[in-house]
């Protein structure tokens, strides 16, 4: 169900926009003559929004829904607003903005804050807190949390039920850890981070050395002595794991966004404002630049260097360095099974076909 404010808390559209972080987005209102600005209780899609909700159009493929939406107001680009004016379309209050998706995001943030108050600060009686741990008076520690020796919880930080904060770990100001997040010892999370349930930061990296003294083919464990450092304004999805470094720390830069079920191995470094979709695996000691995007289920081999501003399509296997910004794709497209088998058989013979072609060219 969408978030709806109680009727008595509904806000006039202009008041709502002025109360969000929308001021820097250069928006203006376009309303039918003599129209009263609507009072807004929530936000929804064009197809589902009611007459007390605001909606948005950021993808042109949904433009036909403007004619049928029940939304009280719609966020659109200047081009869409001008086209509707030229067509004589009327009836909707428009919020005209060059970046409708971003304005929608700001409004969604406002509605989330309005509908989900943080609750009182303090430590739940069932939490277990080591005497040497430091918890800011404005922080909130939920039921069944465990805070180990020397850990520090910053101002305004919120820990959901069942979180574990290992020895010497830190959680920065205004960060939110959802229920059952685990930070092993020596993990440092910056300010305003959001970490979703089941995420584990600081487990041992996959480090083993062949050790014949233990038996034929046996492996000896390499203790992982580094930690994990997460920057400010980072979001980490549910059940994502970030391993501690072998000697140096594993680094997640400021503004990085990690989806659910991502594996970040030891000594990986992820540059600022990189976004990585679900089920990506990043092997050890790979460095990813700033402002990169990595599609879901991609796999990155270890000890690679990925440049800034690289976009990797979903499902791509990256096995060598990427030194130049741009888009990279390594996905073999799906097809009907019989067709795929025929194409795969040809691919296995490419070297032979190449030799035959060169022989023909020499004749």
Curated annotation (Swiss-Prot):
GO terms for biological process: lipid A biosynthetic process. The gene is lpxD. It comes from the Bacteria. The active site is at 266 (proton acceptor). PROSITE patterns: HEXAPEP_TRANSFERASES. GO terms for molecular function: N-acyltransferase activity. Its EC number is 2.3.1.191. It comes from Bordetella parapertussis (strain 12822 / ATCC BAA-587 / NCTC 13253). It catalyses: a UDP-3-O-[(3R)-3-hydroxyacyl]-alpha-D-glucosamine + a (3R)-hydroxyacyl-[ACP] = a UDP-2-N,3-O-bis[(3R)-3-hydroxyacyl]-alpha-D-glucosamine + holo-[ACP] + H(+). Catalyzes the N-acylation of UDP-3-O-acylglucosamine using 3-hydroxyacyl-ACP as the acyl donor. Is involved in the biosynthesis of lipid A, a phosphorylated glycolipid that anchors the lipopolysaccharide to the outer membrane of the cell. InterPro entries: Hexapep, Hexapep_transf_CS, LpxD, Trimer_LpxA-like_sf, UDP_GlcNAc_AcTrfase_non-rep. GO terms for cellular component: membrane. This is UDP-3-O-acylglucosamine N-acyltransferase.
């Amino acid at each position: 169900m969408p978030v709806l404010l109680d009727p008595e808390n509904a806000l006039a559209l202009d008041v709502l926009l002025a109360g969000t972080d929308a001021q820097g987005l250069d928006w203006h209102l376009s309303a039918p003559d003599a129209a009263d600005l609507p009072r807004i209780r929530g936000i929804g899609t064009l197809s589902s929004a009611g007459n007390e909700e605001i909606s948005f159009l950021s993808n042109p493929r949904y433009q036909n829904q403007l004619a049928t939406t029940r939304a009280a107001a719609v966020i659109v680009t200047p081009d869409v607003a001008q086209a509707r004016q030229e067509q004589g379309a009327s009836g909707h209050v428009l919020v005209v903005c060059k970046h409708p998706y971003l304005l929608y995001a700001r409004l969604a943030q406002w509605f989330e804050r309005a509908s989900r108050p943080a609750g009182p600060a303090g430590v739940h009686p069932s939490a277990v807190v080591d005497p040497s741990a430091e918890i800011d008076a404005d922080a909130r520690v939920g039921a069944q949390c465990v805070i180990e020796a020397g850990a520090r919880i910053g101002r305004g930080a919120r820990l959901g039920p069942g979180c574990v904060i290992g020895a010497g770990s830190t959680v920065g100001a205004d960060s939110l850890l959802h229920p059952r997040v685990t930070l092993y010892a020596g993990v440092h999370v910056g300010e305003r981070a959001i970490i979703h349930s089941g995420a584990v930061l600081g487990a041992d990296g996959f480090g083993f050395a062949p050790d014949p003294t233990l038996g034929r083919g046996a492996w000896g464990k390499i203790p992982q002595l580094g930690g994990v450092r997460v920057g400010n304004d980072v979001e980490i999805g549910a059940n994502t794991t970030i391993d501690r470094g072998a000697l140096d720390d594993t680094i997640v830069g400021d503004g990085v966004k990690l989806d659910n079920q991502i594996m970040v191995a030891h000594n990986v470094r992820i540059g600022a404002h990189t976004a990585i979709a679900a089920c990506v695996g990043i092997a050890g000691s790979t460095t990813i630049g700033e402002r990169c995007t990595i599609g879901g289920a991609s796999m990155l081999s270890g000890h690679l260097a990925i440049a800034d501003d690289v976009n990797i399509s979903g499902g791509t296997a990256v096995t060598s360095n990427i030194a130049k910004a741009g888009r990279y794709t390594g996905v073999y497209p799906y097809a009907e099974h019989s067709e795929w088998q025929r194409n795969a058989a040809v691919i296995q013979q490419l070297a032979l076909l190449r030799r035959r072609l060169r022989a023909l060219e020499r004749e």
